[in-house]
């Protein structure tokens, strides 16, 4: 299983960016993506940026990684706050919703 880590760009240079989180900063290869700007979020795997992220998606991934650490540490109480969006019904993307038959008036 591959796990990408969201890191925020602190400084840019040609083909690389200094990126960090709350623990460390390190230089990341950015040649696989459009050149980032300071403040951007990147999904990083094996020292290379694989995609640019918006701040909300970066936070979701960070929460999921924190949840994994909490489970490993046996702290199950921490999970509720880390997966706050799991109490909602999943939504199909619009192109799949269009393929569903119309709902009956009395159906949920």
From Swiss-Prot:
Pfam families of this UniProt entry?
HupF_HypC
**Which GO terms fall under molecular function for this chain's record?**
carbon dioxide binding; iron ion binding
Q: Where is this region: Disordered?
A: 88-108
Stretch forming the signal peptide: none
Q: Which SUPFAM superfamilies match?
A: HupF/HypC-like
Task: Quote the InterPro entries the UniProt record gives.
Answer: Hydgase_assmbl_chp_CS, Hydrogenase_HupF/HypC
Q: Which domain of life is it from?
A: Bacteria
Q: Which biological processes are named by the entry's GO terms?
A: protein maturation
The family database entries (PANTHER family) matched by this protein are listed as: HYDROGENASE MATURATION FACTOR HYBG, HYDROGENASE MATURATION FACTOR HYPC
Family, per the entry? Belongs to the HupF/HypC family.
What's the protein name?
Hydrogenase expression/formation protein HupN
- Supply the source organism's classification: Bacteria, Pseudomonadati, Pseudomonadota, Gammaproteobacteria, Pseudomonadales
């Amino acid at each position: 299983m591959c796990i990408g880590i969201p890191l925020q760009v602190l400084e840019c240079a040609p083909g690389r960016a200094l990126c960090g989180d709350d623990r460390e900063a390190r230089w990341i290869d950015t040649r696989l993506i459009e050149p980032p700007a300071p403040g951007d979020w990147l999904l990083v795997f094996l020292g290379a940026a694989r995609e640019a992220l918006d701040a909300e998606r970066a936070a979701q991934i960070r929460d999921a990684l924190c949840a994994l650490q909490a489970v490993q540490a046996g702290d199950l109480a921490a999970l509720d706050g880390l997966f706050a969006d799991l109490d909602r019904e999943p939504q199909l993307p619009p192109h799949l919703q269009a393929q569903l038959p119309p709902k009956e008036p009395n159906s949920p």
